[in-house]
Amino acid sequence: EDQLRPLGLTTGHSPQSKPIAMYGGLVATRSIGQFSTLYGGIEDMVMGLEAVLPSGEVVRIKDVPRRAGGPDIRHILIGNEGALAYITEVTVKLFAFYPDHNHFLGWRLDAMKPGFEILRDVMAAGYKPSVARLYDAEDGAQHGFDSFASDQCVLIFTTEGPAGVSQATADGIAEIVDARPEVTRVDTEIIRDWFAHLNWGPEKLIEEREFIREHMRMGYTTEVSGNWSVINAVSYTHLTLPTTAC
């Protein structure tokens, strides 16, 4: 990204670990990235790759935009986590980079369920925000949201791309969300500041270690996938079971 952005380009892939990540590792772990709603996951970006098998043999999957027939063998190696091969080179798609066209939207609400419903409505309407995120109160507090949304959930969208597209996407999303009586708008600058501190470099990791030592608690992200019909129940179980089963 550091090399591409001065050229007006981006891969569109932005994991939280971006400052310390390597592309082979992101492909090997099937990284999803924070902008996946717009650009897709890493599996949607990889055109071709090179890998080394346990035997030492080097294999290459050709860089073509689509496989016309048969299984897509890229997906044998994408996400293999080193069990089948070490990924040594990847070829990915590139997109135009528009850093001046971002829009930041946020709302607070009292429960996760209406937040999931809003996310579904936005996606079903065909809008493609770069970020679509719903924080429960506890998770939001770790980002400092308890200063304005104490014991509340926070719903966030960001948009990017050509000026007209980004603006239209932001306007369309806002129209859908503002129609819900459960939500209250959040100051745009709060969301902008949150966005500016999404990624963790070495300094942030050192801070986290010190926090763990001092407070004797830690938190990690667990990726969960579910259909709209079950995701609220999955979220409820995921949040409540660890605190009630012990």
Q: Residue locations for each model-derived region?
A:
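FAD-binding subdomain of flavoenzyme oxidoreductases
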Residues: 1-133
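Non-transmembrane, interaction-prone segments in cytosolic or luminal domains
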Residues: 5-8, 32, 156, 195-197, ...
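Proline-centered helix-kink/hinge sites
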Residues: 15, 241-242
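Intrinsically disordered, low-complexity segments enriched in polar/charged small residues
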Residues: 35, 242-243
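C-terminal substrate-recognition/cap domain of FAD-linked oxidoreductases
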Residues: 92, 96, 106-239
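Single conserved hydrophobic/aromatic residue that forms the stacking wall/gate
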Residues: 238, 244-246
